Amino acid sequence: MTGLVDQQELEKRLATEEDSQNEDIENQLPSIETIINTYREKENRRVNLRFKAIGRTPLLRKTVFSINASQRFEKVTRFLKKELGLPMNSSLVLYVNSSFAPSPDEIVGNLYDNFAIDSHLLINYCINVAFG
């Protein structure tokens, strides 16, 4: 009889410990509302872009613009062509921090998060390929 009581007691303790562990895990996870609010903030976030011409490329009168962080980089290219008065089928090469040319489907917010300097993402632009 003692063995049966000990086993029942042990099962109760294990069940209690498991319940407390589950509660701890639930307390560590963010609520659905928190997750949704974080997503909405990222969707509505705007980032600053600073444009700088390379070589004989036309200059912009205003060099700092703001864009929604969820936009793809191709939107930046189209916007800049429009601002410079270039035809949409013309060549325009954009570089981030004079280092690399991002893919048109890259998300602007990701570039900003990884390469922004002084709260601006520096975009160098030119009509011809400037760097290898």
UniProtKB/Swiss-Prot annotation:
Q: Which UniProt keywords apply?
A: Autophagy, Cytoplasm, Isopeptide bond, Membrane, Nucleus, Protein transport, Transport, Ubl conjugation pathway
Q: Where is this cross-link: Glycyl lysine isopeptide (Gly-Lys) (interchain with K-148 in ATG5)?
A: 132
According to its UniProt record, what is one Pfam family this protein matches? APG12
Q: SUPFAM superfamilies this protein is in?
A: Ubiquitin-like
Q: Is the keyword Secreted in the record? A: no
When this gene is knocked out, what is seen? Impairs atg8-processing.
Q: Which domain of life is it from?
A: Eukaryota
What compartments host this protein? Cytoplasm; Nucleus; Preautophagosomal structure membrane
Keyword field contains Cytoplasm: yes
Q: Which is an annotated GO molecular function term of this record?
A: protein tag activity
Q: Which Gene3D superfamilies match?
A: Phosphatidylinositol 3-kinase Catalytic Subunit, Chain A, domain 1
GO CC term, one of those recorded: autophagosome membrane
Q: Which membrane topology describes this protein?
A: Peripheral membrane protein
One biological process term from GO is: autophagy of mitochondrion
Q: Which CDD domains match?
A: Ubl_ATG12
Subunit structure of this chain's protein: Forms a conjugate with atg5.
- Function per UniProt: Ubiquitin-like protein involved in cytoplasm to vacuole transport (Cvt), autophagy vesicles formation, mitophagy, and nucleophagy. Conjugation with atg5 through a ubiquitin-like conjugating system involving also atg7 as an E1-like activating enzyme and atg10 as an E2-like conjugating enzyme, is essential for its function. The atg12-atg5 conjugate functions as an E3-like enzyme which is required for lipidation of atg8 and atg8 association to the vesicle membranes. Plays a role in meiosis and sporulation.
> What's the family?
Belongs to the ATG12 family.
This protein is called what? Ubiquitin-like protein ATG12
